[in-house]
């Protein structure tokens, strides 16, 4: 069959874009050649509905071993008793948890999207806000930090069945112990969504949700530096508190219910080529090299945030404890949309993002979200962060000056020239 040059030419263009630019989107990263190889392997040919040893198709002897290896490595990485590696995405993992814990119309408490939460934490345009009854907590207007006393007050008033601790645009440590105390006080299931900082959590660099939360979900890309996908974890399995029973009359374990929440609850056959790529990424994450990488991600983020503050940019909460930061551009009289578009012309990729108490729409926004996982994978270190902020500042202050944007682009291209996508 003739090679599809139209598609492969586009893939080549995308590779050039990634090689030439500064990738500062906090949710993006670059995977190893081994992860890429597994994701493009013959495992994509195999259907495997069910779980290892309990499939609805024949010929699963090898993919059973692949999936079990991914499960075992993931358990070791997070010291977890239970792991499911089948979710196609973090959103699918969250969907399975909702299906397992909640019934349509049940109330839950999530992080307000405009304050740093995620679509699946109760946005009205998402299944979580359409099928269920969300109430929200947020951050303090002055500090930009989660107000745990306010969370406790809302929980006491609303009595949610489930509380979600986690964010897509929050740069500080999350106090999972305090969240568990709040959840226990109202009899709620506590779910952590650690999609963003999972790699840092795995190496002990920031607080670990598994000892405190009933259920933990994550993506496998971002700071875990694996293929695009999702996972579900529990530090300890436990009998479900909803009275769901097996045929023998015993209470079902939450692991059984979560597995059913994924298959057949909201997915069919798992993507075994992606699960193989996950297994490789988990293996990489178990190494000392990955520890060195995550330490550098955190150092780079701290330095980047500091450099923004020194340039009179407002960093929400004043800094970062993880891999990302949220920049409020209102004192620069530039919208997030304008900044994203101008930076893109200079081969600097960020995403526009609402800031807490934003007065602009989600399509415009007052801020940008920036992260260091991808540039750290390419080998950049603290001494490169001031240069990055200088380049961003030149774009922000010359947003309609195409000549200056082109000059910045040339400097970006020179800065990244000769650097492979995967160094660290």
From Swiss-Prot:
Transmembrane segments annotated in the record for this chain: none
Pathway: One-carbon metabolism; tetrahydrofolate interconversion; Amino-acid biosynthesis; glycine biosynthesis; glycine from L-serine: step 1/1
Cofactor(s) annotated in UniProt: pyridoxal 5'-phosphate
SUPFAM superfamilies associated with the record: PLP-dependent transferases (SSF53383)
Functional note: Catalyzes the reversible interconversion of serine and glycine with tetrahydrofolate (THF) serving as the one-carbon carrier. This reaction serves as the major source of one-carbon groups required for the biosynthesis of purines, thymidylate, methionine, and other important biomolecules. Also exhibits THF-independent aldolase activity toward beta-hydroxyamino acids, producing glycine and aldehydes, via a retro-aldol mechanism.
Quaternary structure (record): Homodimer.
Protein name: Serine hydroxymethyltransferase
Organism (species): Christiangramia forsetii (strain DSM 17595 / CGMCC 1.15422 / KT0803) (Gramella forsetii)
Taxonomic lineage of the native organism: Bacteria, Pseudomonadati, Bacteroidota, Flavobacteriia, Flavobacteriales
């Amino acid at each position: 069959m003739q090679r599809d040059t139209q598609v492969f030419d586009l893939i080549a263009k995308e590779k050039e874009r990634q090689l030439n630019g500064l990738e500062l989107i906090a949710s993006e990263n670059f995977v190893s050649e081994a992860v890429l190889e597994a994701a493009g392997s013959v495992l994509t040919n195999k259907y495997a509905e069910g779980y290892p040893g309990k499939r609805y198709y024949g010929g699963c002897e090898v993919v059973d071993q692949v999936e079990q290896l991914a499960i075992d490595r993931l358990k070791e990485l997070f010291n977890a008793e239970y792991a499911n590696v089948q979710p196609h995405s973090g959103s699918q993992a969250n969907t399975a948890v909702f299906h397992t814990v909640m019934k349509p119309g049940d109330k839950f408490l999530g992080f307000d999207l405009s304050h740093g939460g995620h679509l699946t934490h109760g946005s009205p345009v998402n299944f979580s806000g359409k099928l269920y009854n969300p109430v929200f907590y947020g951050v303090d207007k002055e500090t930009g930090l989660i107000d745990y006393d306010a969370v406790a007050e809302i929980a006491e008033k609303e009595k949610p069945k489930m509380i979600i601790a986690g964010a897509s645009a929050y740069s500080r440590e999350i106090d999972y112990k305090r969240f568990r105390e709040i959840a226990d006080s109202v009899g709620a299931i506590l779910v952590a969504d650690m999609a963003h900082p999972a790699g840092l959590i795995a190496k002990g660099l920031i607080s670990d949700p598994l000892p405190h939360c009933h259920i933990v979900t994550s993506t496998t890309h971002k700071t875990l530096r694996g293929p695009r996908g999702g996972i579900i974890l529990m530090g300890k399995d436990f009998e479900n508190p909803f009275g769901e029973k097996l045929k023998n009359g015993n209470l079902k374990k939450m692991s059984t219910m979560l597995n059913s929440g994924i298959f057949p609850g909201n997915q069919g056959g798992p993507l075994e080529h992606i699960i193989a790529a996950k297994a490789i990424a988990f293996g990489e994450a178990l190494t000392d090299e990955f520890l060195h990488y995550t330490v550098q991600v955190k150092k780079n983020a701290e330095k980047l945030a500091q450099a923004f503050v020194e340039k009179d940019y407002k960093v929400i909460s004043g800094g970062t404890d993880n891999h990302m930061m949220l920049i409020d551009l209102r004192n620069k009289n530039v919208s997030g949309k304008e900044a994203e578009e101008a930076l893109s012309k200079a081969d600097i990729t960020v995403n526009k993002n609402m800031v807490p108490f934003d007065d602009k729409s989600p399509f415009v926004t007052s801020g940008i979200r920036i992260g260091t996982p991808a540039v750290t994978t390419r080998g950049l270190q603290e001494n490169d962060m001031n240069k990055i902020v200088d380049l961003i500042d030149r774009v922000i202050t010359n947003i309609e000056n195409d000549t200056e944007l082109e000059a910045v682009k040339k400097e970006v291209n020179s800065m990244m020239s000769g650097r492979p996508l995967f160094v660290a």
